[in-house]
A protein has these predicted regions:
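C-terminal boundary and immediately downstream tail of ABC-type ATPase nucleotide-binding domains
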Residues: 160, 167, 171-191
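ABC family nucleotide-binding domain
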Residues: 1-170
């Protein structure tokens, strides 16, 4: 989608600017979607290799090595030959995270990574994300997992109806919100 207003700045450059090579920036940004977006006709391993060979032009052996490294990191290496239909939602999301990591991005964008999961699967995905945060991975996470956001983030933006209501440190937002809409939302969260 093309933004209708505002700007997206990465490394000091406007990504929205028509003169900027958006494809070059996309190669530095990993995305993990709520619906996983895995290729159903490919194995777990193939899902983690294809982007590397097509976008980064890595040879297949190097791509396989990277894929195995990140599948191991998220605990999915025993499932390399499985197809997505054979996996639980939490397993699919961990494969999606491994696929994004195999591209070795500078930042990972997560769009509601736990919203499509059964409650018992949420924890395993959040644990992987918590590990990434502890390792210093820059992440932009859209989430309703408030405890996770409070514990892991260093900057929180609360939005409602597409508008930023308030932003600040986790302690600013969760312990001393200033905006009425933020206060109302957090009161329901604490209830």
């Amino acid at each position: 989608e093309t933004p209708t207003s505002g700007d997206v700045v990465f490394h000091g450059d406007s990504v929205v600017d028509k003169k900027v090579n958006a494809a070059a920036y996309r190669a530095k940004v990993g995305m993990v979607f709520q619906s996983f977006n895995l290729f159903n006709n490919m194995s777990v391993l193939e899902n983690c290799i294809i982007g590397q060979t097509k976008v980064l032009k890595r040879n297949k052996e190097e791509a396989k090595e990277k894929a195995m490294q990140y599948l191991t990191k998220v605990g999915m290496n025993p499932y390399i030959n499985a197809k997505p239909r054979q996996l639980s939602g939490g397993q699919k999301q961990r494969v999606a995270i491994a696929r994004a990591l195999a591209m070795e991005p500078e930042i990972l964008l997560f769009d509601e990574p736990t919203s499509a999961l059964d409650p018992e699967m949420v924890g395993e995905v959040l644990e992987v994300m918590r590990g990434l945060a502890n390792e210093g991975m820059t992440m932009l996470v859209v989430t309703h997992e408030m405890a996770f956001a409070r514990d892991v983030s260093n900057h929180v933006v609360y939005m409602a109806d597409g508008v930023i209501c308030e932003e600040g440190s986790p302690s600013d937002i969760f312990e001393n919100p200033q905006n009425a809409r933020t206060k109302d939302f957090l009161a329901r969260f604490r209830a």
